[in-house]
């Protein structure tokens, strides 16, 4: 969505993501005519706050560091969700989960590289995004106990559009015709991916579905190379591989535990 002086603010991109996704979801609601239950507005507010903050931070981080690095760091969100679930959901975490969380943290340190000449301060923004996305996952678990996936997605986009619309005027820059197209395309792609992912989790086991989400890193690295001519450094590749490996092990282990239960 532009570089240099022509680049749109991450807040404006976030606005586009929610604003243009909303009509798609409203049309889907008219076609599907789903049943709605009484929303838990307090938790929805927390979820939307995390979602808007996380999306904005991710967009901003991607303007400062390679897209592949931003994506890899974002995959820490299941680890953050695991830790937060202890305090919010009362879940108990075993030694294997803690080991995978520690391994993922090592991978993140390889990407961020604190205290070295290769230190990327902007990577901390992506780390913040992973943290709030982790919180969002925990809130989603709470909401899914009483509300349907479509209702959760629809409410999040309605509230997100309102919040983003309140912030956007302060950073507004008139988009070019192509940027309008890209804003709309970003929204449609993100809500479509969200719908596919939600339905995949509905019809398949999480342990089977979740590892496929890590293919995002491969696409991010490809887009870095194809669009921005950015080649990932070996240390970043290693850090990303460690994070992905720990996430896959955790997903597969949880799947086996669920089947035994």
PLM feature segments, named:
Residues 16, 71-76, 143-159, 194-225:
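Helix-helix packing/entry segments at the starts of transmembrane helices
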Residues 96-113, 133, 235-254:
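Hydrophobic transmembrane alpha-helices of multi-pass small-molecule transport proteins
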Residues 1-10, 25, 116-175, 182-183, ...:
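Transmembrane alpha-helical segments that form core, pore/gating elements
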Residues 4, 13, 17, 61, ...:
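Hydrophobic/aromatic residues within transmembrane alpha-helices
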Residues 29-59, 121-129, 174-192:
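Loop-to-transmembrane-helix transition segments
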Residues 26, 48-56, 78-83, 108, ...:
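Hydrophobic/small/kink-forming positions within alpha-helical transmembrane segments
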Residues 33, 78-99, 171, 218-237:
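C-terminal transmembrane-helix exit sites in multi-pass transporters
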Residues 7-53, 132-135, 155-170, 245:
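Transmembrane alpha-helices of multi-pass small-molecule transport proteins
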């Amino acid at each position: 969505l532009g570089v240099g002086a022509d680049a749109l603010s991450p807040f404006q991109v976030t606005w586009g993501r929610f604003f243009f996704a909303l009509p798609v979801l409203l049309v889907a609601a008219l076609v599907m005519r789903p049943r709605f239950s009484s929303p838990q507005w307090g938790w929805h507010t927390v979820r939307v706050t995390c979602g808007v903050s996380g999306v904005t931070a991710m967009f901003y981080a991607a303007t400062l560091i390679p897209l592949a690095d931003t994506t890899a760091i974002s995959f820490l969100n299941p680890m953050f969700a695991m830790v937060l679930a202890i305090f919010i959901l009362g879940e108990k975490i075993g030694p294997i989960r803690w080991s995978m969380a520690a391994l993922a943290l090592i991978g993140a340190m390889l990407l961020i590289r604190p205290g070295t000449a290769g230190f990327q301060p902007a990577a901390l923004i992506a780390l913040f995004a992973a943290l709030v996305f982790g919180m969002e996952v925990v809130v989603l678990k709470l909401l899914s106990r009483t509300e349907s996936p479509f209702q959760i997605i629809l409410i999040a986009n309605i509230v997100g559009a309102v919040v983003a619309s309140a912030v956007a005027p302060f950073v507004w820059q008139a988009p070019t015709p192509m940027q309008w197209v890209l804003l709309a395309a970003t929204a449609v792609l993100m809500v479509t991916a969200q719908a596919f992912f939600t339905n995949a989790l509905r019809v398949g086991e999480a342990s089977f579905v979740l590892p496929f989400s890590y293919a995002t890193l491969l696409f991010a690295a490809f887009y870095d190379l194809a669009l921005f001519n950015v080649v990932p450094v070996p240390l970043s590749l290693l850090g990303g591989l460690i994070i992905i490996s720990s996430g896959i092990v955790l997903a597969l282990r949880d799947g086996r535990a669920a089947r035994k239960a």
